[in-house]
């Protein structure tokens, strides 16, 4: 869906969560560190969830 086209958002908080986002340029789900707040929908707890929703 459209959340897969949203940019990666780390957010202003300083927690350390390993998450995955769909990189629309490469067509792959890629790990990133999420700060814990003010993210968007392109933020998945697992690689499997990212691939399932974004069909990567």
From Swiss-Prot:
Fetch the SMART domains from UniProt.
KU
SUPFAM superfamilies assigned: BPTI-like
Where does it reside? Secreted; Nematocyst
Task: For this UniProt record, give its keywords in alphabetical order, as a comma-separated list.
Answer: Disulfide bond, Ion channel impairing toxin, Nematocyst, Neurotoxin, Protease inhibitor, Secreted, Serine protease inhibitor, Toxin
Give the principal location in a single coarse category: secreted
Q: What InterPro entries does the annotation carry?
A: Kunitz_BPTI, Kunitz_BPTI_sf, Prtase_inh_Kunz-CS, TFPI/VKTCI-like
Which residues make up the annotated site Reactive bond for trypsin?
14-15
Q: Which Pfam families match?
A: Kunitz_BPTI
Signal peptide positions are none
UniProt-recorded name of the protein: TauPI-stichotoxin-Hcr2c
Organism whose genome encodes this protein:
Radianthus crispa (Leathery sea anemone)
């Amino acid at each position: 869906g459209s959340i897969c086209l949203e940019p990666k958002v780390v957010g202003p908080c300083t927690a350390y969560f390993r998450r995955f986002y769909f990189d629309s340029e490469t067509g792959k789900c890629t790990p990133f560190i999420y700060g814990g707040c003010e993210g968007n929908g392109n933020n998945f707890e697992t690689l499997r969830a990212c691939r399932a929703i974004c069909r990567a």
